[in-house]
Amino acid sequence: MLAMLLCTSLAMAQSKFNVKGIIIDKETDEALIAASVQLTKEDGTYVTGKATDMNGAFEMKNVKKDKYKLKITYVGYQPKELDLDLTTQKEKNVDMGYLTMSTDAVMLEAATVTAQASKVQVKGDSLVFNADAYRLPPGSALEELIKRLPGATIEEDGTVKINGKAVSKILVDGKEYFINDKNVALKNLPTNIIDNVKAYDRKSDLARVTGIDDGEDETVLDLTVKKGMMNGWMGQLNGGMGTEKRYNTRANINRFTDSESYSLVASANNIGDRGFGGGGGRGWGRWNGNGLRASKELGFNFATETDKLETGGYIWHRYDGNDSWSQSSSQNFVNKIGAFSQSVNQSYSSNASLSAGFRLEWKPDSMWNIIFRPNASYSRNRGYSYGNSGTYDSDPAEYDEKKLDEAEQAFGDRAEVSDSEIDDIIETIVNTRNSRQQTYSNNKGMNGELQINRKLNNEGRNITLRMTGGFTNSESTQLSASSINYRASTGMDNDINNRYYDTPSRSRNYSIQATYSEPIAKRTYLQFSYRFNYRYNKSDRGAYTYDDLTYSDLVNALKTHRYDVAGAVDELMSLGHEQLYDNSLSQFSEYQNFDHTAGIMLRIVRDKYNLSAGVEILPQHSVLNYKYMGKEYNDITRNVVNFTPTLNLRYKFNDMTNLQVRYNGRTSQPSMTNLLEITDDSDPLNIRMGNSKLKPSFSQNLRAFFNTYDAEHQRSLFSHAYFQLTQNSISNRTYYDESTGVSTTKPENINGNWSGGLGLGMSTAIDKEKYFTIDEFTNFGYTNSVGYLDPVKFPDNDKSTTKGLSLNQSLSFTYRKDWLEASLNGDMTYTHQTNNVLDNNTFNYWDFSYGAELNIMAPWGTTLNSDISMNSRRGYSQASMNTNELIWNVMISHSFFKDRSLTVSLEWNDILKEQSNISRTINAFQRSDSRSNTIYSYGMVRVIYKLNIFGGKFGASGGNQGGFGNFGGWGGGRPGGGGGGRPGGRR
């Protein structure tokens, strides 16, 4: 009986099989990630199914002996069906090898989408975003795609962050694109050519060559160009005219191959470089910045690669003009109530720049590596601004704005008023200031870097020599007029300051570094390095005053010669107004820094983890010659020692799950001018003092990142956490004169500044067919900010402490199938902050939005893109800032010709004209609310022409922009995740 049971058990065990294989593109051999593999019986009954992993592989375990159909589907590819007969199979493991799939050439006419492309995946240390999973308006640039990526943010200053990491460069197929200017790619690269976007930490040149992590990683976005668009020329012409005299033109032509790339880009617009929508429906997007901006750009970029030589370079010209208005109100924490201030400013600027860079990497043989990076730049900047401000005993937000303006005018004129309400406002005014100025500057510089590496064996022993050098010359001038009015009760006369500054400055630097790496055990290395760095800076500011000029006289000259400092000065001289040299306001400084850096680094490389740890010691010798405020200091020297510990751990759980932990510390010295006992009263309302007793500060940063991906469910999880602590940070102790509103600050060391936070993101499909997806991102942050107070006013506790808690939650629910994409989304930011100084010491404010987005793509070439959101604010100081704004954006477009190469669109941003630009900041010293002008509502007609001349069979494409070209089409397109090519060679 036992033998019979054993035989039966063995027979049943051998009647089950494990079926595996790898799905690849027939033409490119590229792995197809998240392809759907289903096993059915011959009558169609479903048995089991899998999605391929990052290598295109699948495995089905414990399949019973029978005859089956193996069905494979993938977006943009022809379905594949194979017969699988296990009744005659003897081996338990059935390897079907490489199964190829062909792209669907008639997908435009009769596409039946059977799977949806995953939005984001994890591959090793990289987050890989599938561009075809995001439906974008026709003609969209890269920035429009980045805005929609889970965990990605574009901040007000243009900084791009992915999962909390700031992006420093953008690459195209692994090659640097305009080297140091990521905005060129964001504003100009068309999204229809992009297959996927990979975010990862790229090693420095030194680390990549030596294999030893030096801790100088930079987060990059690496764009993979669609294979069908390689080996040919492609371009896009995009022109638009709109209401409010708005225009937007953009042109680019590109060639990308496996070994070279060329790009020519040009643009001109006055819409602030914004794309369609401007953030409507997706929370508080202020990426179009402050002010009414116009820009013009022209640039060329190239990169080439052979077995031994890589070259790349760019030349770039840009012009920017900006008309910026802002209003701010603040509460300074100087007493129990706070000192209140309000200001209005208007500025105009005109900036032009020209830059060029080059990169060469030469590998004469397997043992040598030489990298050379020179670059040069020139810029010219002109500015003109004017504004007024006031300081108050109570919050001016409580008063009518018109009467507040009248009260400030009467206060400045010291005039009698009959309106009791205006008289009450005047009683609260401490001082007012009116100012106007114009500036001019030009800057030119050049620098270069040469790195030479020699491997001494193939086990990790090598030596590296690295040299850098550069210089910068600049010239700036400023002509300004300022009038300050004080309370009559102070007995102080109004302060009139008419000044001219002429400031030439020079700087130069060079460094030399030697690095030696030694293997001390199997896959364990020790690196020694030494670097000498010399820096020289010289600035000689000449200050001149016009004592015989009234404030209004100089203002009139500034108005007449806007943007022309030299013209205004010449007019004043022709009218007999003499410049008087002011020795106390003139400033001369000459720095010399001699830095030595010695470091040691240990790196351990294992299959599951990489660990590097090290420390650098930085002795520094500085010499300063300084003259200011009538005092002169010659050959002031300082000798200090800084140190920087680092730790970096990367742990790989599997191909789709990884953890990274990074720690670094850094010693920072106070500036030598802060150490000088000088009282700077050049600004009568803000007096600054020096402090010779300042100590160095030490900052510690700990960051952790975790990513994982489930291919079967298209589920990505990504998270980050951070903690920052600064010991002996330099803070300003503020002494505030309540009668005049004059603040006197003195730098002092303080402890207690720290912050921490946690971010968690998820993108997942929630149904079997992957039509429904949820994207979620949560950010939590806490800050503890401290500063010193006037000990006379606060004898018991002279520290101001502001504690802040912030929570941000964004959620998006999307349905995506064939010709339709619809989403519901929301975004909420809650901030709770307390301060120990004020009587009313709690601040709670909310920014939240909720809305919907709709994208319809008809098969005849018409697309509709629309989003609507309700954006709300609560808890701001002024009632006019606590708003509900219904933002609605819409675009309708139609593509012409068989290849959809010509598209005409009509778009309207902020149809209801309700958008505004408001922000709040709080720290240990103040709470500040501000609003500014920017580009809001306008309509525009665009014409977009896509020129694609390929070496292959593909023509013009619509890609992820909702068109119906050979890439993307109705449901996305070629393999998401790119770079996931099959391992090894074809068997």
Residue positions per predicted region:
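A short, amphipathic beta-strand motif
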Residues: F17-D25, G56, G97-L99
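Short, acidic, small-residue-rich periplasmic hinge/interaction motif at the N-terminus
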Residues: I24, S36-T40, T73-Y77, E91-R135, ...
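Short, acidic Ser/Thr/Gly-rich low-complexity loop/linker segments typical of extracellular
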Residues: E42-A57
